[in-house]
Amino acid sequence: MNTHVMNTYQRLPVTFSHGEGVWLFDTDGKRYLDALCGISVTNLGHTHPAVSAAIKTQADLLLHTSNLYHITPQQQLAHKLCSIAAMDKVFFSNSGAEANEAAIKLARLHASHKGNSHPIIITMTGSFHGRTLATITATASQKMKTGFGPLPAGFIYGEYNNINSAKQL
């Protein structure tokens, strides 16, 4: 397929036109079980009526505004999440990589407030944290990092599911 989209993933030779519940349909009408959409991206399925209605309602009011302003639905959701999770604050992000970047920054900021100017973040082998510079550094796989140096410092890796590896760190 001739495309102007960067080749950042090994794409399969199929083009989807629409989805219904757990099913995707290609441009030839062939149906596929969607088991690869992304983690919690479409966890209620494609075109779920309640999700579609909520998106339509919000789109009719306001699509987007800067976080420099208060957004009523955002405040309502934050309140509900904090109530459920017994937390004081939430951080909304668009992707797992952005959430992990925020976690890295918050951990480093906390360390700085505690007087640690060179904090170390431990992650595990076999993990995946995203495709930003910090998150590929957090990912132990060298293959993910090749060609993107210099990478941020302060990450070490333990062997997943190996308590002795963690103790040695």
Model-predicted segments: where are they?
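Active-site and channel-lining beta-strand-loop segments
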Residues: 13-34
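Short secondary-structure boundary/capping elements
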Residues: 16, 47, 73, 158-161
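Active-site-adjacent loop/helix segments that line or gate small-molecule/cofactor pockets in enzymes
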Residues: 1-20, 68
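Residue-level signal for pocket-adjacent positions within structured domains
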Residues: 4-11, 34-39, 57, 64, ...
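PLP-dependent aspartate aminotransferase-fold enzymes
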Residues: 80-169
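Glycine-rich loop-to-alpha-helix module at the N-terminal edge of alpha/beta enzyme cores
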Residues: 3, 31-116
